[in-house]
Regions:
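N-terminal, intrinsically disordered, polar/charged segments of Gram-positive cell-envelope systems
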Residues: 26-98
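Bacterial N-terminal signal peptides that target proteins for export
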Residues: 1-9
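Beta-sandwich interaction modules
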Residues: 100-103, 130-146, 179-182, 215-229, ...
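Short loop/turn and low-complexity linker motifs enriched in small/turn-promoting residues
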Residues: 66-93, 115, 153-172, 194, ...
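A glycine-anchored, Pro-Gly-centered beta-turn/N-cap motif
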Residues: 97-99, 108-111, 178-190, 259, ...
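Short, surface-exposed beta-strand/strand-loop-strand elements in extracellular ectodomains
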Residues: 118-130, 197-209, 279-292
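Noncatalytic modules at the cell exterior or secretory-pathway interfaces
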Residues: 144-156, 226-238, 309-322
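C-terminal motif of bacterial Sec signal peptides marking the signal peptidase cleavage site
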Residues: 19-22
Length: 340
């Protein structure tokens, strides 16, 4: 279940990539090292007050093509631990039966919602050229955009126009395994997402997985994360997930475990000492939640014991294999007071 930040050199499609470049996931028993999009090491993005890391680093993962992200989801779905066959309520029950459909021939263009009827539901999508995506087992409902020439083949399932699907809300505060629309099923805005198991979901800018301009970002962490959900996005929860999850507070000794924190809200601004709890570790500091290269203020892997960092109000701190301890000036016994 642990994720570790490590340097990566493997090819991009040879392993599962997650939000951190070189993030190792054991969410599904996978212990594969993930590569960066470029496969090359680069300097950290810093401002004038932040010194570049002296350690070898790999560029943190940014948003990626939606097609790459959904292919990783299809890999995960080959042996899902759970399949959600729930049929949502719809305005008009005009479900299309399983079969093969070609957009422009026996299927109109538009966005559809595909639902498995059993644990043996499979889905194949192609762009009519050389692009294809296959879910050997479709683990839950999925939004899919069809354009002229695209084909859709579903077995042991059904589908309907997405516009006919009523709001799919949370049950007892949790969104079940499935695909949801931001602005319809999920409110837009900055929030924390996760569960008692952590966070395991993907945010897509579009449900057209063959659109070269569509992007996606996958999270697979042992803790809740912050994200700015925007209207029109599609979110695929790979486990039951809640919004507005409480970020864990400080330990009894005042330290903070690995996780994601907003400085000025979850932790105070000021100096902190980093204490490694794992030999493979790392941290990132974000200016904002766009999760692009310009969002990154600082990051470092394989942090040495005693490393001191200064966290500014309004930034986001995220770590793996590290404890965050309020800094104590040499010769004193108590951490200095900081203000929120």
């Amino acid at each position: 279940m642990k994720r570790k930040l490590i340097s990566a050199v493997a090819l991009i499609m040879c392993a599962i990539m997650f939000l951190f470049c070189g993030c190792k996931s054991k969410k599904n028993g996978d212990d594969t090292t993930a590569p960066s999009e470029s496969g090359t090491a680069v300097d950290a993005v810093t401002d004038e007050s932040t010194e570049p890391s002296s350690e070898e680093t790999t560029e943190p993962e940014k948003k990626e093509p939606a097609s790459d992200a959904v292919r990783r989801v299809t890999d995960i779905s080959r042996n899902p631990g759970h399949v959600n066959t729930t049929t949502p309520s719809v305005r008009k029950s005009e479900w299309k039966k399983d079969g093969k459909y070609t957009c422009g021939k026996n299927l109109a263009a538009g966005e559809y919602y595909v639902v498995p009827n059993s644990k043996k539901c499979s889905l194949m999508l192609t762009d009519g050229k050389d692009g294809e995506l296959e879910f050997e087992i479709l683990p839950c409902g999925l939004f899919v955009t069809m354009k002229a020439g695209y084909t859709l083949e579903v077995k042991n399932g059904k589908f309907i126009l997405a516009s006919e699907v009523n709001k799919m809300g949370a049950t007892n505060g949790k969104y079940k395994l499935g695909s949801y629309r931001v602005g319809v099923d999920i409110p837009a805005g900055i929030t924390t997402l996760g569960s008692s198991e952590g966070s395991f979901f993907t945010v897509f800018s579009s449900s057209d997985y063959f659109d070269e301009d569509a992007t996606a970002i996958m999270f697979a962490e042992d803790y809740p994360v912050y994200y700015n959900l925007e209207k029109g996005q599609r979110v695929l929860f790979m486990e039951d997930t809640s919004l507005g999850v409480k970020i864990p507070g400080a330990n009894s000794d005042g330290s903070y475990n690995s996780g994601m924190y907003k400085v000025g809200k979850d932790i105070k601004p000021g100096k902190y000492t980093l204490v490694p709890t794992d030999s493979e570790n790392g941290y990132m500091v974000y200016y904002d939640l766009r999760y692009i290269e310009l969002s990154i203020k600082d990051y470092k892997e394989n942090v040495k014991a005693g490393t001191v960092i200064t966290l500014a109000d309004g930034t986001y701190f995220r770590s793996s294999g590290l404890k965050l301890v309020p800094y104590v000036e040499p010769g004193t016994t108590a951490a200095p007071e900081t203000t929120t």
